[in-house]
Each structure stands twice: as C-alpha cells, then as structure tokens.
C-alpha cells in the first residue's frame, strides 16, 4: 500500500480511530500519536503542543457525524500542506467530509483510502488607492439649477392637486379618501367664507332699515332674501 508507506515515513503522524483495529504497520512507528476514541480527538484542538505539529494523519471512523467532526479537528491541528488519508467504506461521504473540513481531495483509491491535503490560501494584500479629490472635480450645486428654479411659485402652483378630473373648465373636488391635501384646503376655504360673512344678532337684517338695529352692518342696504350674498361697502361716504 504505497500511500500508507509514504505516510509512515513522517514522524509527526496522527492516527484517529473509532475503536477499531489500527492500520497494519502503524504500531511502533516513532512519533505516531494514536487517538483511540473520538471523544479524545475533540481535545486535540486545545492541545497547544499538537496544534500545527501534525504533518500526516490517518482517520479510521465509519460513523458519518463523527467522521465530520474528526476531519474538522485534524484540519485545525495539521500543518500547512499536511496530508490526510481516510479509510472508509463510503468513499463519497469521505470525500465530502474532507472537502467540508477544508481539505482538497487529491486521490481516491480503488480500495478504501481517500487522500486529501491542507491548502490554505490567504491571498495577497492589495493596497487600496483612494486617490485625491481635486477642487476642480467638485460640482457647484448652484450651477445645476435653472432660471425657473429661482422663481417664486404662485398661489395656484402651491394649491394641492391630484383629486377630481383634469378638465381645466371644471373645479376639482376632493375625493372620499383624499390624501393629497385638497380636502384640507377646501375646509380652510370654507371656514374662511363663514368667518367673512357678517353675523346677524337680531335676525332682521334682511327686512330693511326700518327693522334693523343701530349696529347692523347692512344699514343703508336694500332688503334682501335670507341667505343671499350681499356685498357690504367698507368705504365711508363724506
């Protein structure tokens, strides 16, 4: 078995099993660390003396979940460019678990072992060129405005729009669920008209001067129908 023979040449060899027999030829190899249970393999990550010291590893774990955990552990303690072989009856699962742990699968034998290598590429540092912004590259915000942008809007332009028909000959009316502000505008106009209309205290303003009180705002005006709009002159006659 050439793969195994190559591994046995390295003194920093780690072998993890799930309690089964060891691979033939690993007994008595100088520098070989044998972990006979997966529970002990979990403690490898905390062993400062072992982290980064393993060059080769042999994994003999058949249970899928335990195999994934062992592969992760071996990857953490292994040196860069270190190699691992997994003896498993399910070659597809062994390849997948190695790749998930971070290994690159390099060889799949016709028998049981799957071979992988630890390659960690941190990439190259790239200097960021933020550049220098010159004053001439700055945009004058006032230069983006047109002449009409400086004109004061008229009252009609400030009025709310959006409700009613677009026919210019028809006055727009606020819709039932008005949200454009036209309903509030109509309400304010209505309140202004009510406030502008003179209040009658005696109720006889429309009957004529003979029935009006001395402070009636309609003194001097001809009789009119109740509810009829009457314009009152605010200029005194001299």
Curated annotation (Swiss-Prot):
<keyword id="KW-0496">Mitochondrion</keyword>
<feature type="region of interest" description="Fe-S binding site A">
    <location>
        <begin position="163"/>
        <end position="180"/>
    </location>
</feature>
<feature type="short sequence motif" description="Cx2C motif 1">
    <location>
        <begin position="202"/>
        <end position="205"/>
    </location>
</feature>
<keyword id="KW-0411">Iron-sulfur</keyword>
<feature type="binding site">
    <location>
        <position position="178"/>
    </location>
    <ligand>
        <name>[2Fe-2S] cluster</name>
    </ligand>
</feature>
<dbReference type="Pfam" id="PF05093">
    <property type="entry name" value="CIAPIN1"/>
</dbReference>
<comment type="subunit">
    <text>Monomer.</text>
</comment>
<dbReference type="InterPro" id="IPR007785">
    <property type="entry name" value="Anamorsin"/>
</dbReference>
<feature type="binding site">
    <location>
        <position position="216"/>
    </location>
    <ligand>
        <name>[4Fe-4S] cluster</name>
    </ligand>
</feature>
<comment type="function">
    <text>Component of the cytosolic iron-sulfur (Fe-S) protein assembly (CIA) machinery. Required for the maturation of extramitochondrial Fe-S proteins. Part of an electron transfer chain functioning in an early step of cytosolic Fe-S biogenesis, facilitating the de novo assembly of a [4Fe-4S] cluster on the cytosolic Fe-S scaffold complex. Electrons are transferred from NADPH via a FAD- and FMN-containing diflavin oxidoreductase.</text>
</comment>
<dbReference type="GO" id="GO:0046872">
    <property type="term" value="F:metal ion binding"/>
</dbReference>
<keyword id="KW-0479">Metal-binding</keyword>
<feature type="binding site">
    <location>
        <position position="205"/>
    </location>
    <ligand>
        <name>[4Fe-4S] cluster</name>
    </ligand>
</feature>
<feature type="region of interest" description="Fe-S binding site B">
    <location>
        <begin position="202"/>
        <end position="216"/>
    </location>
</feature>
<dbReference type="GO" id="GO:0051537">
    <property type="term" value="F:2 iron, 2 sulfur cluster binding"/>
</dbReference>
<dbReference type="GO" id="GO:0051539">
    <property type="term" value="F:4 iron, 4 sulfur cluster binding"/>
</dbReference>
<dbReference type="GO" id="GO:0005758">
    <property type="term" value="C:mitochondrial intermembrane space"/>
</dbReference>
<feature type="binding site">
    <location>
        <position position="202"/>
    </location>
    <ligand>
        <name>[4Fe-4S] cluster</name>
    </ligand>
</feature>
<keyword id="KW-0963">Cytoplasm</keyword>
<feature type="short sequence motif" description="Cx2C motif 2">
    <location>
        <begin position="213"/>
        <end position="216"/>
    </location>
</feature>
<dbReference type="GO" id="GO:0016226">
    <property type="term" value="P:iron-sulfur cluster assembly"/>
</dbReference>
<dbReference type="GO" id="GO:0009055">
    <property type="term" value="F:electron transfer activity"/>
</dbReference>
<feature type="region of interest" description="Linker">
    <location>
        <begin position="121"/>
        <end position="150"/>
    </location>
</feature>
<feature type="binding site">
    <location>
        <position position="213"/>
    </location>
    <ligand>
        <name>[4Fe-4S] cluster</name>
    </ligand>
</feature>
<feature type="region of interest" description="N-terminal SAM-like domain">
    <location>
        <begin position="1"/>
        <end position="121"/>
    </location>
</feature>
<protein>
    <recommendedName>
        <fullName>Anamorsin homolog</fullName>
    </recommendedName>
</protein>
<comment type="similarity">
    <text>Belongs to the anamorsin family.</text>
</comment>
<dbReference type="GO" id="GO:0005737">
    <property type="term" value="C:cytoplasm"/>
</dbReference>
<feature type="binding site">
    <location>
        <position position="163"/>
    </location>
    <ligand>
        <name>[2Fe-2S] cluster</name>
    </ligand>
</feature>
<feature type="binding site">
    <location>
        <position position="175"/>
    </location>
    <ligand>
        <name>[2Fe-2S] cluster</name>
    </ligand>
</feature>
<keyword id="KW-0001">2Fe-2S</keyword>
<keyword id="KW-0408">Iron</keyword>
<keyword id="KW-0004">4Fe-4S</keyword>
<dbReference type="InterPro" id="IPR046408">
    <property type="entry name" value="CIAPIN1"/>
</dbReference>
<feature type="binding site">
    <location>
        <position position="180"/>
    </location>
    <ligand>
        <name>[2Fe-2S] cluster</name>
    </ligand>
</feature>
């Amino acid at each position: 078995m050439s793969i195994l023979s190559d591994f046995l040449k390295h003194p920093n060899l780690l072998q993890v099993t799930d309690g089964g027999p060891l691979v033939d030829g690993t007994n008595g190899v100088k520098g070989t660390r044998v972990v006979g249970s997966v529970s002990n393999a979990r403690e490898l990550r905390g062993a400062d003396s072992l982290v980064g010291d393993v060059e080769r590893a042999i994994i003999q774990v058949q249970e899928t979940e335990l195999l994934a955990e062992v592969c992760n552990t071996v990857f953490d303690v292994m040196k860069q460019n270190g190699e691992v072989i997994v003896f498993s009856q399910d070659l597809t699962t062994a390849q997948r678990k190695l790749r998930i742990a971070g290994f690159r699968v390099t060889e799949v034998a016709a028998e049981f072992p799957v071979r992988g290598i630890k390659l960690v590429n941190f990439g190259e540092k790239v200097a960021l060129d933020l550049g220098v912004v010159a004053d001439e590259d700055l945009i004058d915000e006032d230069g983006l405005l047109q002449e009409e942008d400086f004109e004061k809007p008229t009252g009609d332009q400030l009025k709310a729009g959006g409700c009613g028909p677009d026919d210019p000959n028809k006055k727009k009316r606020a819709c039932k669920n008005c949200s454009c502000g036209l309903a509030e505008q109509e309400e304010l106009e209505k309140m202004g008209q009510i406030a502008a209309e003179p209040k009658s205290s005696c109720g006889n303003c429309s009957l004529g001067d003979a029935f009006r009180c001395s402070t009636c705002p309609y003194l001097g005006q001809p009789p009119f129908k109740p509810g009829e709009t009457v314009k009152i002159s605010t200029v005194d006659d001299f």
